[in-house]
Amino acid sequence: MYTLFLLYTIDPNKLADWRAYAQAEFDPITESGGRITGYYAPTEFAGATSEAFATIDVGTMAEYEVYRAKLAAHPVHQENARKIEASGAIHSSYRAIIQKVEPEAAGK
């Protein structure tokens, strides 16, 4: 299992636009083969208010490549991308493919 980790640098004054984008992406991502672990918005309690995150699971790297192609072609995703770009809510994004470290079974 692999996880796509997305870090967004956002305009904190446009958090509502980013939240609307995140909510609108659930269906296109799921329909394209991704399993959303979550979209995470910043809070004023701790950490930067200009950073938001998303995590999306895929089984294999081959599945990830299929997911990316399907998502890029998804009409709702394309419209979501156009809207968020026009809003200026996202300044930049960073993506990484990460893998969860699990504890070893007892006795190994």
Residue ranges of model-derived segments:
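An amphipathic, aromatic/His-enriched active-site/gating alpha helix that lines ligand/cofactor pockets
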Residues: 20-38, 57-95
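Short, surface-exposed ligand-recognition loops at beta-strand->loop->(often short) alpha-helix junctions
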Residues: 10-20
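Residues that cap or initiate secondary-structure elements
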Residues: 12-14, 60-62, 102
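Long, low-complexity, Ser/Thr/Gly/Pro-rich intrinsically disordered segments that act as flexible linkers
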Residues: 91-108
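Glycine-centered flexibility motif
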Residues: 13, 34, 45-47, 88-89
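Short, well-ordered beta-strand segments in beta-rich or mixed alpha/beta enzyme
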Residues: 2-9, 38-72, 107
